[in-house]
């Protein structure tokens, strides 16, 4: 019997409890190209050595349990166990370590984000030997990523469908998010699209409530976007939220959206679940629908620095599960997001190949082997004065969404949309002429407001509005 396949049954079984590090801490291990690699921020309980804590994470998220079991002898642990292969202290933090764990590919079902997370972030996060645990990053090998469809269409296909190039796309979340009738909701959609926006959006918690059932909303929104298209000559879209209480109901809503001929639907991927999201993404590719993804509930999982899952991991998981857009923070708005960290996972969403860069929180080089990219969506507390910064930070391949920054315009919804479109076009033109938006952005907006009364009114309303709080998610 070769060492690779030797079992404990052949060597004799000894019952009892032994340290995890004796089996699962392997500092000499050389990772394989097919391994899934994980970087965990580990905070051990007092008295627990970091090697034991890292090994416990590797064990409890793969083949291990709290005691030796005789059935270990019926398989090859060397083939299937996770391995903690490196540990390093976290600079500036007491009793925190980054534990690197390698998982053999055979531990995971092909094409299943659900199974991947059930293993890697399952019971181990409640393990008593750990005071706190955070999954900072994952390296998804090409051998595994190729088992996923990924985004239904991707960035280039979306631009071709919309016939829009050379600038960020503009959107707006309809407000108030709850309480409008379907007809009034459709009216707001029409006014925003007619004013110059590319998209309008259901808020994440708009599903099918008593004040507005989903079918009525879909019908009035479809009417609104077709009317706006006819008047502007531009292709328009509204993110029709298909999220529902069951997968069957979700698919029924997506089918109805396709029958209406609209270009895009929406899903809340964390509250809806990865299984539902992947099913919807497959339907969208097969039926020509774009898929907008909202990350509602993400901050419950990712906001604490020492416990949970970093959003860069949730972003990678979404690219695998499938989505053409995902909300990714704004850096400058009301929602959490530090610049370097945000741009790190924005690149992980959009690019084919991303080098390891710890200055941006990227722990591993990631090769997506031509999986379609995802457009990051900047949304939350942004207005026309933010347009230069947003254009400079996110670049062309992004969606900039102004909810209150459109519907809060003193002259109404359509003028609010006009103000945002004028501001965006002015920023793109200035950038293309070689001007520095980071330094000259405010002047670019002031110049444009001289010939756009809608923009001038918006500038006056929001000139003092800032959200200057310290970010929690910093390196």
From Swiss-Prot:
State which residue ranges cross the membrane.
Answer: none
On the tree of life, the source organism's domain of life is Eukaryota
Q: Where is this site: Transition state stabilizer?
A: 334
Q: What is its main location?
A: plastid
EC nos: 4.1.1.39
A Gene Ontology biological process in which this protein takes part is: reductive pentose-phosphate cycle
Q: Record-annotated residues binding substrate?
A: 123, 173, 177, 295, 327, 379
Question: Which cofactors, by name?
Answer: Mg(2+)
Q: Which GO terms describe its molecular function?
A: magnesium ion binding; monooxygenase activity; ribulose-bisphosphate carboxylase activity
* Keyword hit for Disulfide bond: yes
What is the enzyme's class at the highest EC level?
lyase
Catalytic activity annotation: 2 (2R)-3-phosphoglycerate + 2 H(+) = D-ribulose 1,5-bisphosphate + CO2 + H2O; D-ribulose 1,5-bisphosphate + O2 = 2-phosphoglycolate + (2R)-3-phosphoglycerate + 2 H(+)
- Please tell me where Mg(2+) binds in this chain: 201, 203-204
State the UniProt keywords alphabetically: Acetylation, Calvin cycle, Carbon dioxide fixation, Chloroplast, Disulfide bond, Lyase, Magnesium, Metal-binding, Methylation, Monooxygenase, Oxidoreductase, Photorespiration, Photosynthesis, Plastid
Q: Which residues carry this modification: N6,N6,N6-trimethyllysine?
A: 14
Q: Which InterPro entries match?
A: RuBisCO, RuBisCo_large_chain_AS, RuBisCO_lsu_C, RuBisCO_lsu_C_sf, RuBisCO_lsu_fd_N, RuBisCO_lsu_N_sf, RuBisCO_lsuI
Q: Which residues carry this modification: N-acetylproline?
A: 3
Concerning CDD domains, the annotation shows: RuBisCO_large_I
Q: Which family does it belong to?
A: Belongs to the RuBisCO large chain family. Type I subfamily.
Give the matching HAMAP family: RuBisCO_L_type1
The note filed under miscellaneous reads: The basic functional RuBisCO is composed of a large chain homodimer in a 'head-to-tail' conformation. In form I RuBisCO this homodimer is arranged in a barrel-like tetramer with the small subunits forming a tetrameric 'cap' on each end of the 'barrel'.
How does the record describe its quaternary structure? Heterohexadecamer of 8 large chains and 8 small chains; disulfide-linked. The disulfide link is formed within the large subunit homodimers.
Q: Which PANTHER family match?
A: RIBULOSE BISPHOSPHATE CARBOXYLASE, RIBULOSE BISPHOSPHATE CARBOXYLASE LARGE CHAIN
- Protein name (record): Ribulose bisphosphate carboxylase large chain
Q: Which organism is it from?
A: Amborella trichopoda
């Amino acid at each position: 019997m070769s060492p690779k396949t030797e079992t404990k049954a052949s060597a004799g079984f000894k019952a009892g409890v032994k340290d995890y590090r004796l089996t699962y801490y392997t500092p000499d291990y050389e990772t394989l190209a097919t391994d899934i690699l994980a970087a965990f921020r580990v905070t051990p309980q007092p008295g627990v050595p970091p090697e034991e804590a890292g090994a416990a994470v590797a064990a409890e998220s793969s083949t291990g349990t709290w005691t030796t079991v005789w059935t270990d002898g019926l398989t090859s642990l060397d083939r299937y166990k996770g391995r903690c292969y490196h540990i390093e202290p976290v600079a500036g933090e007491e009793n925190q370590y980054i534990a690197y764990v390698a998982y053999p590919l055979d531990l995971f079902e092909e094409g299943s984000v659900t199974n991947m997370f059930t293993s890697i972030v399952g019971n181990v996060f409640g393990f008593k030997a750990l005071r706190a645990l955070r999954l900072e990053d994952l390296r998804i090998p090409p051998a595994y990523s190729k088992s996923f469809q990924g985004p239904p269409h991707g960035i280039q296909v979306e631009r071709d469908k919309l016939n829009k190039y050379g600038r960020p796309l503009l959107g707006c979340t309809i407000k108030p998010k709850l309480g409008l009738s379907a007809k009034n909701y459709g009216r707001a959609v029409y006014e925003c699209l007619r004013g110059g926006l590319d998209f309008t959006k259901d808020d994440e918690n708009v599903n099918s409530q008593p004040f507005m059932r989903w079918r009525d909303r879909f019908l009035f929104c479809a009417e609104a976007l077709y009317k706006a298209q006819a008047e502007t000559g531009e292709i328009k879209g509204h993110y029709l939220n298909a999220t529902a209480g069951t997968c069957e109901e979700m698919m029924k809503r997506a089918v109805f959206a396709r029958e209406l001929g609209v270009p895009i639907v929406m899903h809340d991927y964390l509250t809806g679940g990865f299984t539902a999201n992947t099913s919807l993404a497959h339907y969208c590719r097969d039926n020509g629908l774009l898929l907008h993804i909202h990350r509602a509930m993400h901050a419950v999982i990712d906001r604490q620095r020492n416990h949970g899952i970093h959003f860069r991991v949730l972003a990678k998981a979404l690219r695998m599960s499938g989505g053409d857009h995902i909300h990714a923070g704004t850096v400058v708005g009301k929602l959490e997001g530090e610049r370097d960290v945000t741009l790190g996972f924005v690149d992980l969403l959009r690019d084919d190949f991303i080098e390891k860069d710890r200055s941006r929180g990227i722990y591993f080089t990631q090769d997506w082997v031509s999986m379609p990219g995802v457009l990051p969506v900047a949304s939350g507390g942004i207005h026309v004065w933010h347009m230069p910064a947003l254009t400079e930070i996110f670049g062309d391949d992004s969606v900039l969404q102004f909810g209150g920054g459109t519907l809060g315009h003193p002259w109404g919804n359509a003028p609010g949309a006009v103000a945002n479109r004028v501001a965006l076009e002015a920023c793109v033109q200035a950038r293309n002429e070689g001007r520095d938006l980071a330094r000259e952005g405010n002047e670019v907006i002031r110049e444009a407001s001289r010939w756009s009364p809608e923009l001038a009114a918006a500038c006056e309303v929001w000139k003092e509005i800032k959200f200057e709080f310290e970010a929690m998610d910093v390196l």
